[in-house]
UniProtKB/Swiss-Prot annotation:
Keywords recorded for this protein, A-Z: Chaperone, Cytoplasm
InterPro entries (UniProt xref): PFD_alpha_archaea (IPR011599), Prefoldin (IPR009053), Prefoldin_subunit_alpha (IPR004127)
Subcellular location, record wording: Cytoplasm
SUPFAM superfamilies, per the entry: Prefoldin
Gene: pfdA
Organism: Hyperthermus butylicus (strain DSM 5456 / JCM 9403 / PLM1-5)
Name of the protein described by the UniProt record: Prefoldin subunit alpha
GO cellular component labels: cytoplasm; prefoldin complex
SUBUNIT field: Heterohexamer of two alpha and four beta subunits.
Superkingdom in the source lineage: Archaea
UniProt GO MF annotations: unfolded protein binding
């Protein structure tokens, strides 16, 4: 890439520190989102595994009444022929087992693509954050002692 295609702009130390802070916030938000997506993918995998193992039904099962499994009730599960799948906006659709599995796989694939995009963006921002932080540290070390003391007082 030519130098003419890149713009060069000098920023103040204060602007660099502000950018560093904003980048840190963005990195934290991206990291939290990445974790949420990873958890959701793991949940979908667990549901897919459960549907596979319960295909023929089960004599004894424990069904959680809440998301954390704090309260469980014993149950028997019939052969899984029709399953209710959340279609969005609090709408559930009754589908056969294969269609439910297809839905789960499609959702996992979409989330995996999103996870990949967010992970690449996180890596890009982390690299920029590291470079900016190094530049700030170099500037602070190169600053005259008087400027350093003024900076630390702010």
């Amino acid at each position: 890439m030519s130098q003419a295609g890149q713009s060069s702009r000098t920023i103040t130390l204060e602007e660099a520190l502000e950018q560093l802070s904003l980048l840190e916030s963005q990195l934290n938000q991206l990291q939290a989102t990445i974790r949420e997506i990873e958890v959701r993918i793991a949940q979908l995998t667990a549901v897919e595994d459960a549907l596979a193992s319960l295909a023929e039904g089960a004599e004894d099962a424990l069904i959680p009444l809440d998301g954390r499994g704090t309260v469980l009730v014993p149950a028997s599960i019939k052969k899984l022929e029709r399953i209710l799948v959340h279609a969005g906006l609090n709408v559930f659709v009754e589908v056969d087992r294969e269609k439910a599995l297809e839905y789960l796989r499609d959702e996992k694939a979409a989330l995996s693509k999103l996870l990949d995009a967010y992970s690449r963006e996180y890596a890009r921002l982390a690299q920029y954050y590291s470079a900016l932080r190094s530049a700030i540290e170099s500037a602070l070390q190169a600053a005259p002692p008087q400027a350093k003391s003024q900076q630390s007082q702010q």
